[in-house]
Amino acid sequence: VVLTPGVLAKASNARGLGTEPERWFWFDPPFHRGQSVLLHKQCDDVWRIDFQLGRDADSELEKRPERVIPRIQAMLGPDLPFDLEWVSVYQFACRRIDKLRYGRVIFAGDSAHQVSPFGARGANTGVQDADNLAWKLKLVIDGVAGEALLDSYDAERAFAADDNLLNSTRATDFISPKSRVSLRYRNAVLQLASQEPFARPLINSGRLSTPTPYANSPLNTPDDAPFAGTMKPGTNCVDAPLRHQGRDTWLLDVLNALHGLAGGFTLLAFGPRPALESVADAGVSARVLHVGGDVEDAEGLLAQRYDGRSGTIYLIRPDQHVAARWRSFEAGKIRAALRRCIAVD
């Protein structure tokens, strides 16, 4: 990793990169043949340049200024003044541990799984681990739920880790092909993408991290009625613009204001307001958020994204994943779903 400040922005513009600083990725550029290069604009007039090195590179040798400076000059020109702020060599791996929970020891973030830096999956998945674990751990500590709820952390987040590992490995193989077939595919995609729009989405410089739906989670209650769209049990809630207390806001902000990760569940209700304001069972409760009463779906996007025809109810977990959904408000079914969602059944 090389951090270089100064007039690099002018050099970037001179090379036809435009005036707006943004990330750039080069595959097999003329100034670094056979490898890739990544450019980031950072604060305080600092630029970060990542040069891919060969698998047999000597890390101590490659950190020496006499090795680094010629690479930068080949990229930006021999006459551009710059300072080396920091130089380092790093390696990455795509792997995870067998289990994320061993008794009273729970692993999260980089201690549980490691991915390549492409796609911002490292820090994001660590935050998602914490979101998943926080409300479960609170309910167990409070004596509301048993340790079986912590087992669901392993089931859900190990599944998410595998999904991230798959996507990270695919990106790594595109950026740094390990076989002739992969190299031929990568080069063909790049050549096509310069002329054919259909090929551009195939360029994989790191698909950006998105939350993983827990499709097979033991905490999900299966649908008992048909629904359109993607908001199945286990899926992270899609955001939508709303009006709340006279102000423009968003669904996820309202959910955060209601409960955060304190252990509360939400019943998102479309159509007439349910007779009950909340439903409780086994030490947990779900509070009604009525669309049309508590919040206003002024643009209709919430109903569209959730297939929210009149009478529809969604049970939403504290980490903003869908636990269950129904076409009518039935307290008995909601109580059963709550028990299932805290692993007491």
Question: Language-model segments: what does each one mean?
Answer:
Residues L139-D345:
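Helical substrate-recognition/capping region of FAD-dependent monooxygenase/halogenase enzymes
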Residues V1-I203, R207, P211, L289:
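Core Rossmann-like FAD-binding/catalytic domain of the broad FAD-dependent monooxygenase superfamily
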